[in-house]
C-alpha cells in the first residue's frame, strides 16, 4: 500500500491520476482486495489488520485530494498559457460578404446616380390617393382588394409598390425631375416567388413636353440591363400599366440556359425583368402638371438578385439559413 502513495506522487496529469485512483479505490482495486482478506482472519488479528487498512486508505484519500487539486491548478495554468491572446498580433478574422439584396441595391445606385438620378426615400405607410388614385388605378382595380393589400383601420395602408414616391416627388418638386426610389413594398402573398415584403426600384424622368421620348427610355433601360447582366439579348413587348401609356415589358435572354430552354424560363429562352413606359397624362393631371412628358420604369430587386445569384426560392433571402447566406 506504500507503493500507491509513491505512485501518486509521480502523477503529472488527470489521466494518470484517474488510473491510480481506480487501481486503489476501484471495485477491483488494492483496498477492495485487502478488505476481502479480512474474512480469512479472526479476533485481534482481524481488528488490527482492519485498522491498518483504514489508516492507509484515509492517508491515500487525503494524498489523492491534495494531488488532484495540484494537478487541476497545473492543467488550468497550462491551458491559460495556450489560450492567451496577444492583442497586438494580427488576427485573420473571417469577414462576411454583402447580402445579395444589398449588393443588388448598391449596383443599381452606382449605375443611375452618375447619370443625374437623385435617390428619393418615401414612407412605407401611404394613403389611397398616393398609392392608387394618383396612379390612375380606379376604385374597382383588383390591387385595392383587401386580399392583396395590407390596410389599417384609419384607411391607411402599407404601400404595394414604390410608385407613391414618384407622386410625392412631383408634388414637392418641379420639372425637370430625374429620380429613383428603392425600398420595401408589401402585398399579401407568400410562395416560392412572392413574399409579404419585397423590394422594388422605380425610376422617373419628367421634363417639358417634347423633351422626353420613348427612345430616351429605351436607351436608359438597355444600357442598364447590359451593365447589370452583361452581354444578354433584350426583347421588348407591348404591355399595359394604368400609370404609363404606351407601356412595355422587357425580357432578357435566359442567364441559366443561354436560350436553349430550361425550367426557369419555361423553355422559352426569355426571362421577364421589368416594366416601363411613358407616364400617363392622367397621372400628370392628378398632380396638376401641364405641358410635360416623362417616362417611368420599375423592377423587383429580389428578381434581379435571384437571376444574378441563381436562386430559385425567393424566401431564401429572408430566412436565417447560414448554409444559404454563406454561399454568396
From Swiss-Prot:
Q: How is the cofactor bound?
A: Binds 2 magnesium ions per tetramer.
Q: Please give the organism.
A: Helicobacter pylori (strain G27)
Give the similarity note. Belongs to the class-II aminoacyl-tRNA synthetase family. Phe-tRNA synthetase alpha subunit type 1 subfamily.
**What is one GO cellular-component annotation here?**
cytoplasm
Mind listing the UniProt keywords for this protein, alphabetically? Aminoacyl-tRNA synthetase, ATP-binding, Cytoplasm, Ligase, Magnesium, Metal-binding, Nucleotide-binding, Protein biosynthesis
Please list the cofactors this protein needs: Mg(2+)
PANTHER family found in the cross-reference section: PHENYLALANINE--TRNA LIGASE, MITOCHONDRIAL (PTHR11538:SF41), PHENYLALANYL-TRNA SYNTHETASE (PTHR11538)
Q: What is this protein identified as?
A: Phenylalanine--tRNA ligase alpha subunit
Give GO terms: molecular function aspect only: ATP binding; magnesium ion binding; phenylalanine-tRNA ligase activity; tRNA binding
One matching Pfam family: Phe_tRNA-synt_N
Amino acid at each position: 500500500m506504500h507503493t500507491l502513495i509513491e505512485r501518486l506522487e509521480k502523477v503529472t496529469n488527470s489521466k494518470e491520476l484517474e488510473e491510480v485512483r481506480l487501481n486503489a479505490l476501484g471495485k477491483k482495486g488494492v483496498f477492495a482486495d485487502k478488505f476481502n482478506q479480512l474474512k480469512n482472519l479472526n479476533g485481534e488479528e482481524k481488528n488490527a489488520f482492519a485498522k491498518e487498512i483504514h489508516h492507509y486508505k484515509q492517508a491515500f484519500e487525503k494524498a489523492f485530494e491534495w494531488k488532484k487539486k495540484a494537478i487541476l491548478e497545473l492543467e488550468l495554468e497550462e491551458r491559460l498559457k495556450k489560450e492567451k491572446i496577444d492583442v497586438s498580433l494580427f488576427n485573420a478574422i473571417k469577414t462576411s460578404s454583402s447580402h445579395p439584396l444589398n449588393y443588388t441595391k448598391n449596383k443599381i445606385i452606382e449605375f443611375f446616380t452618375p447619370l443625374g438620378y437623385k435617390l428619393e426615400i418615401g414612407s412605407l405607410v401611404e394613403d389611397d390617393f398616393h398609392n392608387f388614385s394618383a396612379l390612375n388605378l380606379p376604385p374597382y382595380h383588383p390591387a385595392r382588394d383587401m386580399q392583396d393589400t395590407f390596410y389599417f383601420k384609419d384607411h391607411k395602408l402599407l404601400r404595394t409598390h414604390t410608385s407613391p414616391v414618384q407622386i410625392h416627388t412631383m408634388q414637392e418638386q418641379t420639372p425637370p425631375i430625374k429620380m429613383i426610389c428603392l425600398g420595401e413594398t408589401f402585398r399579401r402573398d407568400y410562395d416560392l416567388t412572392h413574399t409579404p415584403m419585397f423590394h422594388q426600384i422605380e425610376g422617373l424622368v419628367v421634363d417639358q413636353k417634347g423633351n422626353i421620348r420613348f427612345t430616351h427610355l429605351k436607351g436608359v433601360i438597355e444600357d442598364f440591363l447590359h451593365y447589370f447582366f452583361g452581354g444578354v439579348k433584350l426583347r421588348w413587348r407591348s404591355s399595359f400599366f394604368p400609370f404609363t401609356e404606351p407601356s412595355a415589358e422587357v425580357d432578357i435572354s435566359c442567364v441559366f440556359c443561354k436560350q436553349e430552354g430550361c425550367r426557369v424560363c419555361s423553355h422559352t429562352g426569355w426571362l421577364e425583368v421589368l416594366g416601363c413606359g411613358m407616364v400617363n397624362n392622367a397621372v400628370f393631371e392628378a398632380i396638376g402638371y401641364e405641358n410635360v412628358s416623362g417616362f417611368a420604369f420599375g423592377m423587383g430587386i429580389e428578381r434581379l438578385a435571384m437571376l444574378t445569384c441563381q436562386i430559385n426560392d425567393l424566401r431564401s433571402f429572408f430566412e436565417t439559413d447560414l448554409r444559404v447566406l454563406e454561399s454568396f
